[in-house]
Amino acid sequence: MNTKSNPYYYGILFILLAYLSFGILDTIQKTAVQYHSVFQLLFIKYLFCLLFSFFIARKNKVKKFYISNNYKIQITRCILSTLESCFFVLSFRYLALADAHTIGSLSPVLFFVFSYIILKEKISLSTWIAIIISFVGVILIMRPGINIFNPYLIIPLLAAFFYSLYQIATRLNAEHDNNETMLFYNGLIGSIITLVFSYFFWQPLHAFSFIFFIFVGLFFCTGLYLQIKALSISPASILAPYHYSIIIWAILFGFLVYNEIPDIFTLFGAIIIVASGIFIFRYSNK
């Protein structure tokens, strides 16, 4: 691939690097969440997000980024973001990285469902079929009714549910506020919520805790910056399918770091979810 044949090359490259950074972040969080509460980790992440928002606002020369034109939607989306993050990071405590990410990758599909319900957007019959097929992939992974069913798989499913609602709220909020404002409130409200809950679910800090915290913040901000950079170069519709690359990193890092090997059901379920998701993205943007 070269920039002449594909003008979005750098955008695609940046988004792939962003998901690599998020993949490393989640690998670190999987270990960190064994020793710290979810809220402690998320407080660090949202605090870094808050500091990062000042950098982005200054870089883009946006002065009144701290003023929202619709606080109701803004606060709602931030609460949804916090709920999604809580469930997703919690899932790392009980599940393999590949399982958590594969189930979590249902969120783009759920987004289309909620777009139909909440935003009243039209969805074609072929898209509905792809949505149903993607749920078959989830059922294949979860295997309800079978003795080996793992109830902890419901945790990333809840994360996918809240993340899809967060995306809906973000789309609504984008009509009133710019990206710098949304990033600022994500960090501010997320920090406040997780700080309060950290007090009630506090776990003693260790000598290595601050190493975890630094790397969590570093890789989160790196991924966030690369994601923003990618979206500034290429349309979201072009970049959306590359979201699924994080499943590859989850499988790879899960195997290398935690000796996790996905079973055949997880692999087939992942293929079904990814294929359905890519079809929906491509078909809906024609």
Go through the PLM ranges and name each one:
Residues 35-83, 162-165, 185-200:
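Transmembrane alpha-helices of multi-pass small-molecule transport proteins
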Residues 100-106, 173-189, 224-255:
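Helix-helix packing/entry segments at the starts of transmembrane helices
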Residues 1-40, 148-172:
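Glycine-/small-residue-enriched transmembrane alpha-helix faces in small-molecule transporters
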Residues 2, 49-69, 136-148, 190-209, ...:
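Membrane-interface helix-cap regions at the ends of transmembrane helices
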Residues 88-90, 107-129, 201, 248-267:
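C-terminal transmembrane-helix exit sites in multi-pass transporters
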Residues 126-142, 265-284:
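Hydrophobic transmembrane alpha-helices of multi-pass small-molecule transport proteins
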Residues 32, 41, 91, 97, ...:
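Hydrophobic/aromatic residues within transmembrane alpha-helices
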